Amino acid sequence: MLLFWWWELGDPCAWTGKGRGTLKMSPATTGTFLLTVYTLFSKVHSDRNVYPSAGVLFVHVLEREYFKGEFPPYPKPGEVSNDPITFNTNLMGYPDRPGWLRYIQRTPYSDGVLYGSPTAENVGKPTIIEITAYNRRTFETARHNLIINIMSAEEFPLPYQAEFFIKNMNVEEMLASEVLGDFLGAVKNVWQPERLNAINITSALDRGGRVPLPINDMKEGVYVMVGADVAFSSCLREVENPQNQLRCSQEMEPVITCDKKFRTHFHIDWCKISLVDKTKQVSTYQEVVRGEGILPDGGEYKPPSDSLKSRDYYTDFLVTLAVPSAVALVLFLILAYIMCCRREGVEKRDMQTPDIQLVHHSSIQKSTKELRDMSKNREIAWPLSTLPVFHPVTGEVIPPTHTDNYDSTNMPLMQAQQNLPHQTQIPQPQTTGKWYP
């Protein structure tokens, strides 16, 4: 009603020729003002307060249906949209969530879940979690704030705690209220305490477990910790029997009498159950005794005197430079004597070498020289070293000389061999005629 009268009177801060407060608001201005007021009220409405207890499991579901109306174009009444939506959660002013708070969302078409066990250090301190929703189809965003006010529990922590490993569950399935309620009901039938609370839920992947194969509907597994105010029942104590411990060491299932109460919906690995009795644990906490904050008196400060004694570094110089230099000089002289004064020389080597070896070496050098000269000029006569010395049939000595008008450099090899004097004739095969033995 006040808003209606304010709109009729106009803007009191507007100035016209007739005075102040006589200007009417246009419909566009009115619409903008109403949209601003609606935005402010919707932002206040988006901040949600929750009051979990320290040491008790906290679960908050981020429903996609709740955020669908935040993205334009706004759906009409009765219209159903199935846009993919993901969430990003962080502590206000920080890039990540608190250490005790976890978040999981399997697919953009499923709801997100915030879960964890608040600690006693945050009791009385409001924890503001920024929740940003992303519409993956329209790329629109919406941001809400979740204010977590952690309350102190009556009995924290509960003295008796048991951790179960459920093999046929994923963490988001176990966080459902009806599933978690069924599990706590089964534990209560076995344990029969007066108070029973779920303390924490952890995925097996966070404990180093393997990702299951996508066959036979395999699950990751979940660790569920519960606490009670009475001692463990005899059924839970059966895991500590030597027979069951032996079966667990052999990778066999232990025999537990109360397993049938869980087997309907929950497959528990009894070898991984953990029983913790807080009443028998010795506290290692030592109270810190704070002093006055004054350091003990160490006496009067005495700085070093201005007149320092002179120090001679000549000996240090000799040890550091002179000694290595002298050793290097001696080694250099020894090396020079070996390289320069201990050489045999060519004459001494020839005197110690036999004559036959020298002649053989000299003939090899001469032949090598002739071959090199041939490669430079191929129009010269054959070298003497390639001519035959003895006739292969008669054994006569043939002088290794050529006639002056004999030139075989341009003659084929076979023809040159046939024209040589004293050359043995090679018999030619007969093409016609008879053959007689």
From Swiss-Prot:
Transmembrane segments: 318-338
InterPro entries noted in UniProt: Cadg (IPR006644), Sarcoglycan_alpha/epsilon (IPR008908), Sarcoglycan_C (IPR048347), Sarcoglycan_N (IPR048346)
Protein origin, superkingdom: Eukaryota
Pfam families, sorted: Sarcoglycan_2 (PF05510), Sarcoglycan_2_C (PF20989)
Residues in coiled coil: none
Tissue expression as described in the entry: Identified in all tissues tested. Expression highest in lung and placenta, moderate in brain, heart and skeletal muscle, low in kidney and liver. Also detected in embryo.
PTM note: N-glycosylated. Ubiquitinated, leading to its degradation by the proteasome.
Cytoplasmic compartment residues: 339-437
Sugar-modified residues: N200
Compartments reported by the entry: Cell membrane, Sarcolemma; Golgi apparatus; Cell projection, Dendrite; Cytoplasm, Cytoskeleton
Keyword Metal-binding assigned: no
Keywords per UniProt: Cell membrane, Cell projection, Cytoplasm, Cytoskeleton, Glycoprotein, Golgi apparatus, Membrane, Transmembrane, Transmembrane helix, Ubl conjugation
Physiological role: Component of the sarcoglycan complex, a subcomplex of the dystrophin-glycoprotein complex which forms a link between the F-actin cytoskeleton and the extracellular matrix.
Family statement: Belongs to the sarcoglycan alpha/epsilon family.
Stated name of the protein: Epsilon-sarcoglycan
Species annotation: Mus musculus
